[in-house]
């Protein structure tokens, strides 16, 4: 496995600030015009110890999420951080325990986000199961997340859909292997499956980043969870795809910093650089600026 921070490629690393007692994690970076920003999550637990909840009721200790929006300067510093207002979202049955791992993307000249709305009540109360994690699609207006629609499926847990904007149409990678693409129908506020044909297949993995334009095609990041002794190790793959959903190339597995738990939720491209955003152990939120050309050479050759 390759480690990007030990590749010898020059990079800049921006750690987004801790806002409350919640640990920061899993940022999603976006570049819109001349602005760069990143959403990221605060969580009330520690992965470094079993049942390590440090905020909330001891009787009903469940994961709880806060979300923030950071403005990033041209000098690659954090200019400001605000809460993403979600109290109205938490009034929803499917989001009682917050929104997890928002992915920011631009569509039709506006900023949108999709994330996993969490409801742990059925597990706590041992009642008939409700959907525990539901993908919620909405628009980010300043620092307010306004839900548009939930995407209801027959799965108990939905997460990590990958937004993919092609021209003015919005798609999501629902599953990498086999490749399942969903198209959003705005008039009906629902998604439909799109037929795809690709000679090259993606590996067995899960979604991570959005898809963004790169060198005439699109680039994105997948994550893989590998069971180890009493733990799970996360690894990533970069991949290229065409606007017709043809998989063009898949990189070797890599880690950002060599940590066991890393999770990439964002990628952006500007002036020949990749901006890769990821969490470390659900306790740090990082944006990495690194040469796109040298990164591609390191991961694909």
Segments the model singles out, each with a brief description of its role:
Residues 1-301:
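Beta-propeller domains
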């Amino acid at each position: 496995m390759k480690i990007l921070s030990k590749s010898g490629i020059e990079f800049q690393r921006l750690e987004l600030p801790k806002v409350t007692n919640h640990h920061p994690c899993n940022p999603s970076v976006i570049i819109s015009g001349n602005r760069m920003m990143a959403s990221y999550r605060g969580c009330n637990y520690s992965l470094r110890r079993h049942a390590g909840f440090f905020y909330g009721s001891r009787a009903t200790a469940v994961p709880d999420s806060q979300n923030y929006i950071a403005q990033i300067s041209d000098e690659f510093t954090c200019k400001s951080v605000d809460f993403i207002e979600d109290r109205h979202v938490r009034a929803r049955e499917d989001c009682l325990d917050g929104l997890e791992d928002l992915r920011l993307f631009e569509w039709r000249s506006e900023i949108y986000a999709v994330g996993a709305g969490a409801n742990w009540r059925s597990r706590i109360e041992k009642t008939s199961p409700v959907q525990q994690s539901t993908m919620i699609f909405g628009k980010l207006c300043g620092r307010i997340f306004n839900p548009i629609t939930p995407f209801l499926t027959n799965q108990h847990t939905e997460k990590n859909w990958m937004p993919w904007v092609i021209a003015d149409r919005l798609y999501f990678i629902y599953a990498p292997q086999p490749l399942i693409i969903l198209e959003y129908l705005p008039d009906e506020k629902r998604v439909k499956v799109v037929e795809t044909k690709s000679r090259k297949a993606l590996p067995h993995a899960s979604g991570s980043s959005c898809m963004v334009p790169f060198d005439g095609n699109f680039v994105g990041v997948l994550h893989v969870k590998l069971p180890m002794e009493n733990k799970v190790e996360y690894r990533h793959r970069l991949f290229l795809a065409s606007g017709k959903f043809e998989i063009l190339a898949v990189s070797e597995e890599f880690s950002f910093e060599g940590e066991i738990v890393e999770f990439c939720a964002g990628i952006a491209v500007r002036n020949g650089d990749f901006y890769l955003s990821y969490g470390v152990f659900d306790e740090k939120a990082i944006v990495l600026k690194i040469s796109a050309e040298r990164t591609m050479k390191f991961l694909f050759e």
